Amino acid sequence: MITEQNLEKFRVQCENIFTQIGRDVIGQKEVIEGAVIAMIAGGNVLLEGVPGVGKTRLVRSLGRVFDLPFSRIQFTPDLMPADVTGTNIIVKGDDGNSTFEFQPGPIFSNIILADEINRATPKTQSALLEAMQEHTVTVMGVSRKLEEPFFVLATQNPVEQDGTYPLPEAQMDRFMFKIIVKNPSLDELMDIVNMTQKTMAEVADAACNGDDLLEMRKTANAIPVATEVLKYAMMLCSATHPDSECASEAAKKYVRLGASPRAGQALISAAKVKALMNGRYNVSYSDINELAFPVLRHRMKLTFEAVAERVSADEIIKMIIDELVEKTKIKDEKSAAPVVTATAEETTAVDEGENKKRKLFGRK
């Protein structure tokens, strides 16, 4: 059961998180929001952007703000799987006998920064697969559980591709979001330069801890989703498949392989968090449409025709959404989705939900 106290606590914690991150990272509002949503929802994040736009700084700031142990792994072509997961070493005891002792690798932390992940070989990249999905690490036949909460936040440079190894579909699918980190605006760039002239120190303080984060996730998971909204979200994911009964014309022309069921899971989990952040009891169609881009852009394999015409994944997603909105005759508004009350027992009109939201968050 969701109470007003739960929602108020969630709101205050989110405000504190964004405030503290903002002390370290200037601008990048959408990037910060996406990373926080994914972490609360329990997903991994792939940050893609050119060097110098603050990807690594953001991840380090997240570690401090959530007060969680942080490990950085710099991926290079000579990095081996054992350098990530750890390995057994021979240790001689006091009695003179030698035994194997496990030496944990940097993966045994709560927040993992996989810096320039596409520079490592596929063999090393695959060392993250089990950890990202099952939150376990198997070395020499022995599985070890990773401490919760556990996140992988990876970075990659989309421009410099020489000597890199594109991530395989199996690993890309394990990232809840792929977030594009853009260059700062002129005003943001001026603020960045002014700040760094004074100090380069990262000053964010802890806003919550691991237990708080798990509690926020539990609160978000309890948010109900209206059947109509859930069906719309699943239709959107299915519409990315060119051979699906829900296939859009854009997918038939430009998509070779659509999103997996993980996309649907990620979309709903993230939409619940976003609804709470916006002070609503319900997941709306707009939540689904906005989050479709980071959830789907890395899960679609494009056709040669799309590459030749330079049609991006985001443009295809926009076409699919427009076609689906027209097909289902829904309004792309937050008020289009049914609202479920805090008791999760009755469905009320949207106006009631909006009034409760204003009351909770002190908005006029």
Model-derived features: where do they sit?
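P-loop (Walker A) phosphate-binding loop of NTP-binding proteins
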Residues: 50, 84, 155
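Conserved C-terminal "switch" segment of AAA+ ATPases
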Residues: 6-11, 24, 164, 178-250, ...
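Walker B catalytic acidic pair
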Residues: 115-116, 127
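Pre-Walker A (pre-P-loop) alpha-helix and adjacent loop at the N terminus of AAA/AAA+ ATPase modules
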Residues: 8-53
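Canonical AAA+ ATPase core
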Residues: 91-95, 120-124, 132-223, 272-274
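C-terminal engagement/docking regions of AAA+ P-loop ATPases
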Residues: 1-2, 243-364
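Walker A/P-loop
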Residues: 36-77
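Conserved alpha-helical scaffold flanking the Walker A/P-loop in AAA+ ATPase domains
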Residues: 34-36, 91-113
